[in-house]
A protein has these predicted regions:
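A short, conserved beta-to-alpha structural element at the edge of catalytic cores
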Residues: 192-217, 221, 234
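A short alpha/beta connector and helix-capping loop motif
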Residues: 179-204, 254-260
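Conserved thiamine diphosphate
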Residues: 164, 213-246, 300-302
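Short acidic, glycine/serine/threonine-rich loops at helix termini
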Residues: 103-105, 132, 181-183, 209-213, ...
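Generic beta-sheet signal
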Residues: 89-91, 166-170, 197, 252-261
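Glycine/aspartate-rich loop-and-adjacent alpha/beta segment that forms the canonical ThDP
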Residues: 66, 224, 240-305
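Cofactor-binding active-site loop characterized by glycine-rich and histidine/acidic residues
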Residues: 20, 36-191
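N-terminal capping segment at the start of a domain
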Residues: 13-29, 202-204
């Protein structure tokens, strides 16, 4: 592990929020609520749970030279997880709009150079706003939401046929359970008893069109998943000990950790924006100044305490 990598999940989660907030301030907007809700989830994965190949130091992202095709250079965002191995874990990120949060987590973990965020969403950069298979931390393009769980199932089945023992983790959002492909994937995972698949779900109950329960309710989610043959743990998504225990618990079945989270966690001034939290774009200079003050007086102070 790189010497400057953060190894404590609680510290890493705070660093993720701080980096995303700084980026949002510098760019007049961003997916801040996703960082608030998922910081502990990604921190637990990268700091405690995932068994990845060691990293000699933070890497710079490759340039985007051409769309995938014959003769085009192949760039995989999975290189930031180190060399794959039969006993090592894989992580498939499903909600590609969480890309900024994933980049922040990789920086905290010492796997991505912090200057990478200077390339965010720029022409010719792989550090995209919506992550793709060439973006840091993304092994696959998960495109429309709900595709990654199926992809992870195929990866896990292939690994079983190769007698590999490593696990395949999936980071998901709760809105994906409004889509049929997710449930087809759960059914297949259970049928093939792919117990090396472990999904952690950011249940922040918020989506692009507003609160989940005003669009399409998904509860009782745990009951539904169990009926499909999966094992389930429901936990406080900001409790790193509970998250780690749930992610590591062997069950003999595909396992889902439903992490119930708060999309304003760590940045309570966002509550004034409820119920619309999906993407933060400052409405005027006054609002931006309020967030700047919070960043300087709370988030930055907390990083030095």
């Amino acid at each position: 592990m790189y010497a400057d990598a953060v190894t404590d999940p609680t510290r890493m989660a705070a660093g993720i929020r701080r980096r995303v907030m700084a980026h949002v301030l510098a760019n007049n907007g961003g997916y801040l609520s996703q960082a608030c809700s998922s910081a502990e989830l990604l921190a637990c994965l990268y700091a405690s749970v995932l068994k990845l190949a060691p990293c000699d130091g933070p890497m710079h992202p490759a340039a985007f030279e051409a769309v995938p095709g014959p003769g085009a250079p192949r760039v995989s965002g999975g290189v930031f997880h180190g060399e794959p191995g039969p006993e090592l874990d894989r992580l498939i990120v499903s909600p590609a709009h969480y890309a900024l949060v994933v980049y922040a987590a990789l920086i905290e973990a010492g796997r991505l150079d912090e200057s990478a965020l200077d390339q965010f969403n720029k022409d010719g950069s792989t550090v995209e706003m919506i992550g793709a298979e060439h973006s840091p931390g993304f092994e696959t393009t998960t495109g429309s939401l709900a595709q990654a769980l199926s992809t992870a199932g195929g990866i896990a089945l292939g690994r079983r046929l190769r007698h590999e023992t490593g696990r395949t983790f999936v980071f998901m959002s709760d809105g994906e359970f409004q889509e049929g492909q997710t449930w087809e994937a759960v059914q297949a995972l259970a049928f093939y008893r792919l117990d090396t698949v472990r999904a952690v779900v950011d249940v922040n109950r918020a989506q692009c069109d507003g609160p989940m329960d005003t669009v399409m309710t998904i509860e009782p989610l745990a009951t539904k998943l169990k009926a499909f043959g999966a094992s389930v743990d429901s936990v406080d998504g900001h409790d790193v000990a509970a998250l780690t225990d749930a992610l590591e618990r062997p069950t003999g079945r595909p396992h889902f950790v439903l992490a119930y989270t708060d999309p304003t966690r760590g940045v309570p001034i966002m509550n004034a924006r409820r119920p619309v939290l999906h993407y933060l774009r400052f409405t005027d200079s006054k609002e931006r100044a309020e967030y700047q003050k919070f960043y300087e007086e709370v988030l930055l102070v907390g990083s030095t305490s």
